[in-house]
Regions:
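A short alpha-helical cap/connector motif
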Residues: 1-204
Length: 204
């Protein structure tokens, strides 16, 4: 919904270029969205690194494939399954963007476009609920634990600190406490208009 990932660029120069790892995006760009994949691919190229962009929807993967980005590896898989195997690539992750498994902003009365999303998820064998969104994001972070570098940025889309309740809401609401236990700190979080949170370890 927001473009929190754009704010992460300001922290990239704090990554040690001598030991920087790979860039990973869970949830590729899709037709009509904010264009995160080419932007993050450009950042990765600046450090002579590749971007691994992962999406469970083959249509989204095909959309990114047509961009012909020369330093991007496109993986049609769930984020959880990909991240379980990532350490086998012998690379650490220095930048992880979680922008997958959509959030239903009005579950009591979903908008028409959300109903269309839910139908697409069912076609892919998924049940699009907010609980399942949080479960997926937590599973992804748990799977990525061993691969996350000593210096690392994690950007969580559609996730914000709820000041009324004193906890994190949105997609990665369950994942942020886990990241804090891994030594990450919240660099910034905002509700409207960007609805996102950036965490870092070994940053600042």
């Amino acid at each position: 919904m927001g473009q929190i990932y754009r704010r992460a660029e300001q922290y990239l120069d704090q990554l040690d270029p001598e030991c920087i790892g790979q860039f990973v995006e869970i949830g590729t760009s899709r037709n009509g969205d904010d264009g995160s994949t080419p932007t993050i691919a450009g950042w990765a190229k600046r450090f002579d690194r590749r971007l691994w962009t992962v999406d469970i929807d083959p249509d989204n993967c095909d959309f990114v494939c047509r961009m012909n980005l020369d330093n991007v590896e496109i993986v049609n898989q769930s984020g959880e399954e990909f991240l379980k195997k990532f350490p086998a690539h012998n690379n650490s992750i220095s930048f992880l963007y979680l922008d997958n498994f959509d959030w239903d902003w009005h579950p009591e009365k979903p908008e028409d476009f959300v109903l269309e999303q839910k139908q697409r998820y069912r076609m892919l064998g998924q049940d699009m609920t907010n609980l399942n969104s949080q479960r997926a994001h937590l599973a992804q972070i748990v799977a990525a634990t061993l691969a996350l570098g000593k210096q690392c940025l994690v950007v969580c889309d559609d996730t914000w600190y709820n000041r009324w309740w004193g906890h994190y809401s949105g997609k990665s609401g369950a994942a942020i406490p886990y990241l804090l236990n891994l030594g990450f700190t919240v660099l910034e979080t905002e509700e409207q208009p960007v609805y996102g949170t950036i965490l870092g370890r070994g940053i600042g």
